[in-house]
Amino acid sequence: SDVYKRQVPNGHMAGSVSRVASSVDEAVAMVEDLASHNVDLIKLMITGGVMDAKVKGEPGILMMKPDMIKACCDAAHKHNLPVAAHVQSPDGVRAAVRNGVDTIEHGSVLTSHEIDAFKEKNASLVCTLSPALPMAKFPREILGITDVVQYNSNVVFNNMVAGAKAALENGVKVGLGTDTGCPYTTHYNMWRELKYFTKYVGVTPKFALYTATLGNAEIAGLDAITGSIEVGKSADILVADKNPLDDFKNMAVPYMVVARGKVYKEKLVKKYEKCETELDKYC
């Protein structure tokens, strides 16, 4: 999928993977331009982030004004494009959901106000513990990060866990993701996200597996195509030698993978052993 991230000056990822808009009109023009290139969705960077934060508490600061959020969402929805958003605070969640964002990536502590907004707008929360756990739990010297970054990472990690729990307890749809590309967050370790989901959020292995498969497909609007093994759906299957419900690590080295009907048996992924050794200490 093509994911395009929208941002404001000095916001999260501005100047790297994000386009930068200084006004509502400029932001809407960017959404229109992206829509003309047949993208799959629009992503907004609504609050600050951990890696670019300069002070403690900055990851949750609301960086994009509600009128810009709404204008971007309205423009995207006009083209039937869903809107995702990087959000790491209650204020950010409230501003995002109330102004049209469809899926919140990361999340935060949720009060009754945020829960009500999720339900009213039929929005979803995507929990991503994989990028936050190493930054919060690993010794700083391994990552080469500052005290500020680790402090913020702990806040973000704990708030994501609390937010996911609150969402599930109140009937808000929750998905799982990895935010791959962050330090010690690889493309091949989705199984760890499921394990974190059971360990820290407290769900059953069966529910975690559902969330990562059909649950995610439902959030993405792809459940008629993939997410479960059914007649007429795309054959997207990971086959393991042992039952993943006994231990999600059984998916780490699959017997084979079927993607869109094509079978892959050769182990094509080269893993970073130092990364695996450190991550194994936590699950």
What do these predicted regions represent?
Residues 47, 129-132, 180-182:
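Short glycine-enriched loops at secondary-structure junctions
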Residues 22-125, 141-143, 154-174, 224:
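Histidine/acidic residue-rich metal-binding segments in metalloenzymes
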Residues 212-214, 231-277:
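C-terminal cap of metal-dependent C-N hydrolases
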Residues 124, 128, 132-151:
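Active-site loop ensemble at the mouth of alpha/beta enzyme cores that anchors a bound cofactor
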Residues 78, 82, 143-148, 157-243:
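His/Asp/Glu-enriched, well-ordered alpha-helical/loop segment
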Residues 9-15, 52-57, 140-150, 189-199:
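Short glycine/proline- and charge-enriched loop/turn segments
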Residues 107-112, 129-133, 202, 262-263:
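Short, acidic/turn-prone active-site loops that include or flank metal/cofactor-
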Residues 1-4:
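Short, small-residue-biased leader/transition segments that mark boundaries at the very start
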